[in-house]
Regions:
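Active-site acidic/histidine proton-transfer and metal-coordination neighborhood
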Residues: 1-52, 62
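Histidine-acidic metal/acid-base catalytic patches
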Residues: 33-52, 61-147
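Short, contiguous strand/loop micro-motifs
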Residues: 26-29, 57, 90-92
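Generic enzyme active-site microenvironment
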Residues: 21-22, 54-57, 118
């Protein structure tokens, strides 16, 4: 049923001139698409040019996968990313987890990634002072930005 509805949504997206992006979740969040093999199979079965992929590096870490695995699977159809520092379960600001920011950026550069990066800082320990968390996050990211 999910595939049928996703395909229908893709046809509407095509008529509207937009793309849909599918995200893989963790296995405690979904029973449909929670790892690379299931994402690849759903993507293949939908088979519509208006369906693209996104990667959440928290979900990939929890599944024991890498960003490289996802680029190898989807190539240029990987256009969006929840880009966080995981442990791998928490949605941390950069510097609070154990994900290598420099390695993630190297992989994106090697694959000429020009898609969107979203900071989905959603762990509850940031809720009391989100401004401070954002400030710390951007200070870490600034070290990797070019003028």
């Amino acid at each position: 049923r999910c595939r049928v509805h996703l395909y229908r949504l893709c046809r509407v997206a095509e008529a509207e001139g937009i793309l849909l992006v599918m995200e893989s979740l963790r296995d405690d969040e979904s029973n449909l698409v929670y790892d690379l093999p299931r994402a690849r199979e759903m993507y293949r079965q939908i088979g519509h040019p208006n369906l693209k992929m996104m990667v959440d590096n928290i979900a990939t870490g929890a599944a024991g996968e890498t960003l490289e695995d996802w680029f190898n699977a989807f190539g240029d159809d990987l256009i969006h990313m929840h880009f966080l520092d995981g442990d791998p379960w928490l949605h941390n600001v950069w510097g609070d987890g154990n994900t290598s920011l420099s390695r993630q950026l190297q992989i994106m550069q090697a694959h000429h990634f020009t898609g969107y990066l979203v900071q989905e800082v959603a762990d509850e320990h940031y809720f009391t002072d989100p401004f401070s968390a954002d400030r710390r996050n951007f200070r870490v990211l600034e070290r990797f930005l070019e003028d």
